[in-house]
């Protein structure tokens, strides 16, 4: 249920956000983190570095784990306040992440990886299938979409607790409180 405070998004904004989210999630599935960064709202980088943004995924990839994103799906979108001609919206999406542990070395990482993923996705959303050597994580995450007149299109912030400090420094408090 949307709060009475939620702004409805115009059909034009809705379509624009859908198209951008679709591109964003496809790039995530391809693990093209460099291009994903182009979809980020630039002021966030005054408060966090680009390399920190996907650190966990890159760390896993460097250790030899072939991440597989799948079943990405937008669950809902909610318009937030418009402040100084900048529009904001909150997008909830779902995805799954498979981490095949194809070598003995990678299987040895499982006791370390599972707790890290559980702290990121919630204990109930991470399964380790030893017989298939596969860790699966299901997640529901949030993006904040921002349409700032300084930029030509909707851009995103990864809206989660790991980014809290940077978000608080980037987004007006009344928008943040509403989200």
Where are these regions (language model features)?
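Short charge-dense sequence patches
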Residues: 6-11, 42-43, 121-122
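Generic detector of well-ordered alpha-helical segments enriched in charged/polar residues
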Residues: 22, 54-58, 168, 172, ...
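Intrinsic-disorder-associated interaction segments
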Residues: 10, 46-49, 160, 164
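Hydrophobic, Leu/Ile/Phe/Ala-enriched alpha-helical segments that form helix-helix packing faces
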Residues: 28, 57-61, 145
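Exposed beta-sheet edge and beta->alpha loop/turn motif
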Residues: 81-179
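C-terminal segment of classical bacterial N-terminal signal peptides
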Residues: 1-5
């Amino acid at each position: 249920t949307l709060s009475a405070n939620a702004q409805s998004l115009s059909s034009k904004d809705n379509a624009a956000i859908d198209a951008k989210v679709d591109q964003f999630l496809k790039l995530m599935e391809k693990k093209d983190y460099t291009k994903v960064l182009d979809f980020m709202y630039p002021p966030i980088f005054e408060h966090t570095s680009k390399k920190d943004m996907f650190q966990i995924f890159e760390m896993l990839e460097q250790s030899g784990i072939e991440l597989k994103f799948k079943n990405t799906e937008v669950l809902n979108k909610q318009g937030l306040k418009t402040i100084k001609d900048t529009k904001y919206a909150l997008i909830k999406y779902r995805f799954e992440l498979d981490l095949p542990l194809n070598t003995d070395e990678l299987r040895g990482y499982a006791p370390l990886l599972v707790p890290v993923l559980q702290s990121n996705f919630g204990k109930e959303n991470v399964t380790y299938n030893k017989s298939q050597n596969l860790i699966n994580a299901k997640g529901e995450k949030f993006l904040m979409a921002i349409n700032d007149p300084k930029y030509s299109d909707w851009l995103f912030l990864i809206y989660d607790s790991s980014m809290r400090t940077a978000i608080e420094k980037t987004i007006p408090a009344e928008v943040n409180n509403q989200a």
